[in-house]
Every structure is written in structure tokens, then in C-alpha cells.
Amino acid sequence: SALFLPMVLLGLHHGLIPIYAVQLEQMGGVSLFPVLSMGGAGQVGAAIAIYLVARKVGNKKMQGIITGALPAGFLGVGEPLIYGVTLPMGKPFITAGIGAGFGGAYIMFTQVMANAWGPSGLVAIPLMQGATGMLNFLIGLIIAYIGGFIVTKLWIKDSDVREEEENFETTNVEEKY
């Protein structure tokens, strides 16, 4: 799960679907999907940490981006947080992956299996096998949220989130040509 986000960037996560299908057929459930779902949860935790720092330093633009992208993140759509927040900042993209790793490790330890695959995040809870699987998946999400939050909070500084002053050239177009 810690390495899932770079796969998303490259679109390689779609290549895992045949593996899910083979697991479902041969094992009666999918073990890889619940683990990889933690990638988005790490993003959510990292984004919440960044939001708190952005509020502290007065970066309204970042607060707005996170506020708009966070609901989708909780529902398992991580791309708005990846492309709008963590990847442009750099370090939080890594810290989100580390947080995801904690949740993924818990999912593997508790052997959560899914009956199918689909969106990740909170909406994936009903896809897990049995009440225990659903509960452990939820606990894994919470661990990844908290892991992403803590690692990001420890790693970023106020200066990483402070809004940069915009410097636009005011050169007349006619002067250039």
C-alpha cells in the first residue's frame, strides 16, 4: 500500500484488475484490493495535517483545495488530493505513502478479504467479507488516516505550506514582438 500511489500516478493500478480477478476465482476473495485501498487513506491523513498547517499560516488557497478534495478522498477518490495537494508539495506525497503502509500492514495482519473490488475508502467497507472483515477494514482506514496525519505533521514545516507570492511579469506583449 505504501507504493500504490506511484502506481496511480502512472495509471498502473488498472493493471492490477486481472490479479484481483484471479484472486477472486482461486481464493474466493481479493486480498490485494483492501491493502491497496489504504493508499487513499494515507492521502486523507496527510491532507488533514496540511490543512491544519495551512490554516495556521493563513494559506487560504491550500485550505480551499483541501476542503474541496477531502470528501472525495474519504470516498476513495485520491487523485484530487494527489494532484492538487501532496504531489505538488513533494514531501507529503511520500508521507501519505508511509501512512498508507501502516494501514496496509494492519489489513495484511488481519487477513481482510474483499468479495469484489471497486472504489476504496469508506464506500469499500461493504465489499469486505463478513462483519469482522468490514470492521478490520475500517480500523485499517483509521490507522492509515492517523499514520498519514502523524508522519506528515512531523515531516512538513510551516514554510512548506506558506503561500508563495505570485510574481507575474507585466511586460507589454507588443514590446516582446
Kindly label every feature range from the protein language model.
Residues 1-2, 64:
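Alpha-helical transmembrane segments of multi-pass membrane proteins
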Residues 2-13, 27-30, 72-75, 107:
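Transmembrane alpha-helix interface/packing and boundary motifs in multi-pass membrane proteins
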Residues 3-15, 56-60, 88-94:
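Membrane-helix interface "capping/anchor" motifs
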Residues 3-7, 38, 71, 138-142:
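Hydrophobic alpha-helical transmembrane segments of multi-pass membrane proteins
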Residues 18-74, 78, 85-89:
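Membrane-embedded helical hairpins/re-entrant loop segments and their flanking transmembrane helices
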Residues 19-23, 50, 57, 68, ...:
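Transmembrane alpha-helical segments and their short flanking loops
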